[in-house]
Amino acid sequence: MKRRSIVLALILALLAPGLALAADLPTAKPEQVGLSSERLARITQVLRADVERGRIPGAVVVVARKGRVAYVQAVGFRDKTAGTPMTPDAIFRLASMTKPLVTVAALSLYEEGRLLLADPVSKYIPALKTQTVGVERAPVEREMTIQDLMRHTSGLTYGNRGTTEIYKMYPESSNVSSLTLTMDEFIERLSKAPLLYQPGTRWEYSLSTDVLGRVVEIVSGKPLGEFLAERIYRPLKMTDTTFLVPADKRARVAQPLPTHPDTGAEYKLHDPTVPRKFDCGGGCAVSTAGDYARFAQMLLNRGRLEGARVLGTKTVELMTSDHLGQISRGTNYFAGPGYTWGLGVSVREANGLAPMAGTAGDYFWPGAFATYWWADPKEEMVVVSMMQSPLGRHYIPLLRALVLQAIVE
C-alpha cells in the first residue's frame, strides 16, 4: 500500500509541471533555448529515485534560459505523512535564501542615497557602537559597516557555528530567536556579545543580514516584510513570498520527512503560519519556486522584469562583484573554492577551481532547509530548486551537474 501511494504521488506530480508557473514567466520547449529534453529528464529521474529511497519527501525544480522557462517539475510529496503530492505552487521555508531578498531591499535604499555601504552600522543602530572583539574584549579597530553586513565581514557570527564561549553568547539563529525575542531584545543580545574578529578582516557566516534587515526598517520607517513587499514582491508579482503564511495557503506548505534520512533523528521545521516577534531578514521568509524564479530572473536581467525595475543595472553589477578581495575566508567558508562573496550572494571567480559545474560570474546562495538557486549571466540561465530536507548540501553540486549537462548549444 505504501509503495502504491508513492507511485501515485509521483504520477500526479509528473502531471503537474507548469500548472502554476506557465503564467508567471514565458515558457519554451527546451530545444528552443539550447537545452536537451532528454538530458533534462535526468533531473526528474534522479529526484524520483531519491523520493522512492526515502531521501527526500519531494521537490520542485525550475530551469529558465534566455528568459523562458524550459523545465518545471514537481516530484514526490508536499506532505508525505499525509500522502499529499508535490505541486509547483508549494510554499517552502527559504531559510538563508531570504538574505538576497533583504540585500536587494537595502540596495534600493542605497540607490536613493538613504544609506551608503561605508556607513557605520551604529549610525542606524547605536547599540552596536560599543562592541568589543574576542574573549579579551579588545576595542574595535574600525566599526562594522553596511558593506560588512552584506558580505559577512562584520565580526558577528551564529551561535551554532562553533562551541567556544563567544559562540555561546550568540543566538543560534534568527529562525529560532524571532519566535521568543523581539527585535530590540535580539539587538541587545548581539550588542553584549563580543565580535568574533575585527570587522572587515575575515568572512564569517553570521546574523549580519538580520541586522541589515533592522537597518532597512529604521531607514524606511516600515516593518521589513512591508518594505520587501513594496520594493520587491509586488513589483515582481511574487504573490506567495512573505514572512507569515496566511490561513488560506496553509495546505500548500511543503513539509519535511519526520526523521533525518541518515541518522533517524527527529527532523522538524518551524511552522510558517505561526507569527514571529520580528521579521528576521536572515532566514525567515517563505516562497514558491515560481516566485523566486521571478526574483532571480530580475537579477539576471540586471534589475528589471516585465517593465518593473527593482534595481539599476550598475547596482546589480555591484552586488554580483567580488567584495572580499584579500580578506581572509577563514576555515568555515562553505561557499567553497572558486567562489568569492558579493553583496548577499556568492560569486564564481573562475570556470574551474570549484568542485562543481558552473561559469565564471554565476552567483547563488542556498538555504539550510535544502532550498537553492543560481543565476548564470553567460548562459542566460536561472535555476531554482526547492525541497525541505537536512540534505541540502548534497543537492547543490548534484543539481548543477544535472542542469548544466543539459546545455547542448
Where are the regions that the model predicts?
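Short, conserved catalytic-motif segment at the N-terminal edge
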Residues: 26-94, 116, 130-136, 268-270, ...
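Short, conserved phosphate/pyrophosphate- and ester-handling motifs at nucleotide-, phospho-/glycolipid
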Residues: 36, 99, 288
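Active-site SXXK
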Residues: 41-48, 61, 67-69, 92-121, ...
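Bacterial N-terminal signal peptides
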Residues: 9-18
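Short, well-ordered beta-strand elements
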Residues: 373-374, 379-389
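Bacterial N-terminal signal peptides that target proteins for export
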Residues: 1-8
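Boundary at the C-terminal end of the N-terminal hydrophobic targeting segment
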Residues: 20-22
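Short, surface-exposed loop or secondary-structure junction motifs
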Residues: 26, 132-359
